[in-house]
Amino acid sequence: MDLRNPNRDPNSRRVLYRTNKEENRKELKHVKIDESTLAQEGKKLDLPKKRFYRQRAHSNPFSDHQLDYPTSPDDMNWSKLFPHYYDSTTGKMTKDVTIADIGCGFGGLLIDLSPAFPEDLILGMEIRVQVTNYVEDRIIALRTNHAKDYQYQNINVIRGNAMKFLPNFFQRAQLSKMFFCFPDPHFKQRKHKARIITNTLLSEYAYVLKDNGVIYTITDVEDLHNWMVKHLEEHPLFERYDKEWEDNDKCVQIMRNATEEGKKVERKKGDKFVACFRRLPNPAIV
């Protein structure tokens, strides 16, 4: 066994745990879990343990991650992610994804948004492999353990790079809400181009957001908060909501308290900086 890297030992607890979860994931990832298949004949699934899914805190969005992505939104097979909303008689989805959590981390926001917006399909996008696996296993367990009430059928996660391939997944004006919760601050000046909010990326976000759709941002890094606010305020298709709106918005309350990063900041008595922006209609062409 290599003590420096227990993942190389095929008999280590972490490797055995991941192997077991991977087999379970292959079996249940795209299965329509309902009362007829209730919890694998009554068997409950344990929620995944985060310590077995260790990965670096951040990932380089410009690297070649060998990701699978559709060539266009029309080629995206949503039935695999949301089988409960697939109509086999028509061969079509009964709903479209309308809420996206970009860089969803360990899925805390997805889990809390699910019961708050039961009529919406909610997708998390995460670039890190093991973190994505953790969220997949978490959703599988929640769907299975709550199959009788059809809970958590409206959320799922994909491994994807939103900075490169977002328009490959979503049609124009498809989304009503986009969340950017505690993104990588990329402190060094030369890495600012890798931040998730830039002028170029905001135009892509505006493309997939419908009129009056909302971009939600939260961070514990004031410099990053100021950066995101500056770029959003400078973009002609976004307008900031005032503090009163933020204080009364249900999503802001969930966003402040649901994510793992948010809970960590809370434990450390840190600050959380929130900014929300409305997607303006395209200007009329005279």
Curated annotation (Swiss-Prot):
Provide this UniProt record's keywords sorted from A to Z: Methyltransferase, Nucleus, RNA-binding, S-adenosyl-L-methionine, Transferase, tRNA processing, tRNA-binding
Q: Which GO terms describe its molecular function?
A: tRNA (guanine(46)-N7)-methyltransferase activity; tRNA binding
Protein location: Nucleus
PROSITE patterns xrefs: SAM_MT_TRMB
Q: Which reaction does it catalyse?
A: guanosine(46) in tRNA + S-adenosyl-L-methionine = N(7)-methylguanosine(46) in tRNA + S-adenosyl-L-homocysteine
Pathway the protein acts in: tRNA modification; N(7)-methylguanine-tRNA biosynthesis
Active site, renumbered: D184
Q: InterPro entries per the record?
A: SAM-dependent_MTases_sf, Trm8_euk, tRNA_(Gua-N-7)_MeTrfase_Trmb
Q: Just give the chief location class.
A: nucleus
Q: What does the record give as EC number?
A: 2.1.1.33
Q: Quote the record's binding site residues for S-adenosyl-L-methionine.
A: G103, E126, I127, N161, A162, C181, T259, E260, E261
Query: Which Gene3D superfamilies does the protein's record reference?
Result: Vaccinia Virus protein VP39
Tell me which GO cellular component terms the UniProt record holds.
Answer: nucleus; tRNA (m7G46) methyltransferase complex
- Binding partners and assembly: Forms a complex with TRM82.
Please give the family membership noted in the entry: Belongs to the class I-like SAM-binding methyltransferase superfamily. TrmB family.
According to its UniProt entry, the function of this protein is described as: Catalyzes the formation of N(7)-methylguanine at position 46 (m7G46) in tRNA.
Q: Return the protein name.
A: tRNA (guanine-N(7)-)-methyltransferase
Give the organism, scientific name.
Vanderwaltozyma polyspora (strain ATCC 22028 / DSM 70294 / BCRC 21397 / CBS 2163 / NBRC 10782 / NRRL Y-8283 / UCD 57-17)
What is the primary gene name for this protein?
A: TRM8
